[in-house]
């Protein structure tokens, strides 16, 4: 009886210790644990800390968005993508620049909001990494207080980029050394990978720290969710329309689409399924940016055991030919991505026969 009680007490103490260890695992500590004795450990940990700081600043601004002037609404300008720019787009973009400008960690920042990369001034410490980012994904959701996010990717500079064209960034997604996103929702979460699994952290407002909540996340092989803007149905080719008709006819599927890649992908990462943003007949290249959105998410999903595809090619195999290149995106559980691809292959077979 005594031995049984002692074992139970020991088990309780072990559980409490494990919970305490988890509660004490901050983002920077976790990165250092992941990299162990790597010579890059301190730099990558500092990089992630800075990204986390940018996320905290943006999250704080978003929580007061309706109370502050010059926060919601449009600026009246368009970005390099030809899209109307929200005031929070500019704020979020400037936050990342401010956070990294004096860090000594990066040499450039490339954003979907800027036509050309921002080069760290010569009077500031200059690092060897490049941060590519979408400062505020889903900003059309802002005025209705729905989920938005930030997406990031880290690459190492190759060469000296003397001509300022950043051609070394025009490589495939396997060249990324870190990627992730920050989700601004009921809580603020940061999800990242440095090539050793996918890990999720929640911002504890009382501590001001991102605390580990899920380690080594694995996406289910198949899931019930399909996430796509069906308002574009008649703009797609037959393969996409056939896929949508298939999930409408078969039980076990549920549609979820929130208008922000980060929020929609986050659900699929945990529940399984597929997110689609295919090209249209008029714009087969799609809408999402390869370097700032598709490749970082592709890196994450592969680390979690899923897949990301253009429909004909793995996202991480795509070599960019320009900084703001767009690409179709099919991302999620392996079985669900393969199902979408099967409709694309069938349509090509029919077209070739014709």
Swiss-Prot record:
Keywords: Calvin cycle, Carbohydrate metabolism, Cytoplasm, Hydrolase, Magnesium, Metal-binding. One of its GO terms (biological process) is reductive pentose-phosphate cycle. The keyword RNA-binding does not apply. One of its GO terms (cellular component) is cytosol. Mg(2+) 2 binds at residues 134, 137, 293. It is an enzyme of class 3 (hydrolase). Its main location: cytoplasm. Mg(2+) 1 binds at residues 112, 134, 136. The keyword Iron does not apply. This is Fructose-1,6-bisphosphatase class 1. The gene is fbp.
């Amino acid at each position: 009886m005594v031995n049984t009680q002692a074992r139970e007490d020991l088990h309780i103490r072990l559980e409490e210790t494990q919970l305490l260890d988890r509660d004490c695992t901050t983002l920077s500590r976790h990165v250092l644990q992941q990299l162990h004795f790597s010579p890059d450990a301190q730099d990558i940990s500092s990089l992630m800390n800075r990204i986390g700081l940018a996320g905290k600043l943006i999250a704080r601004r978003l929580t007061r968005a309706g109370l502050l002037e010059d926060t919601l609404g449009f600026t009246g300008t368009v970005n390099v993508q030809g899209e109307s720019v929200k005031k929070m787009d500019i704020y979020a973009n400037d936050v990342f620049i401010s956070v990294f400008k004096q860090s000594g960690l990066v040499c450039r920042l490339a954003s979907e909001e800027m036509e050309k990369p921002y080069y760290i001034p010569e009077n500031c410490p200059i690092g060897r990494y490049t941060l590519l980012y979408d400062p505020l994904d889903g900003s059309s959701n802002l005025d209705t207080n729905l989920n938005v996010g930030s997406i990031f990717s880290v690459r190492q500079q190759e060469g000296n980029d003397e001509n300022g064209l950043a051609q070394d960034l025009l490589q495939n997604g396997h060249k990324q050394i870190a990627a992730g996103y920050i989700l601004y929702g009921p809580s603020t979460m940061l999800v990242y990978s440095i090539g050793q699994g996918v890990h999720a952290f929640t911002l504890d407002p009382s501590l001001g720290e991102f605390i580990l909540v899920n380690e080594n996340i694995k996406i289910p092989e198949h899931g019930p969710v399909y996430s796509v803007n069906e308002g574009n149905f008649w703009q797609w080719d037959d393969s996409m329309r056939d896929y949508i008709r298939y999930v409408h006819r078969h039980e076990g599927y549920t549609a979820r689409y929130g208008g922000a890649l980060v929020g929609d992908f986050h659900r699929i990462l945990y529940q399984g399924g597929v997110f689609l943003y295919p090209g249209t007949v008029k714009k087969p290249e799609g809408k999402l940016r390869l370097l700032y959105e598709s490749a970082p998410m592709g890196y994450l999903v592969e680390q979690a055991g899923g897949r990301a595809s253009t429909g004909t090619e793995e996202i991480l195999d795509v070599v960019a030919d320009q900084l703001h290149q767009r690409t179709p995106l099919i991302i999620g559980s392996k079985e669900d991505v393969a199902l979408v691809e099967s409709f694309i292959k069938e349509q090509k077979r029919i077209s070739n026969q014709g």
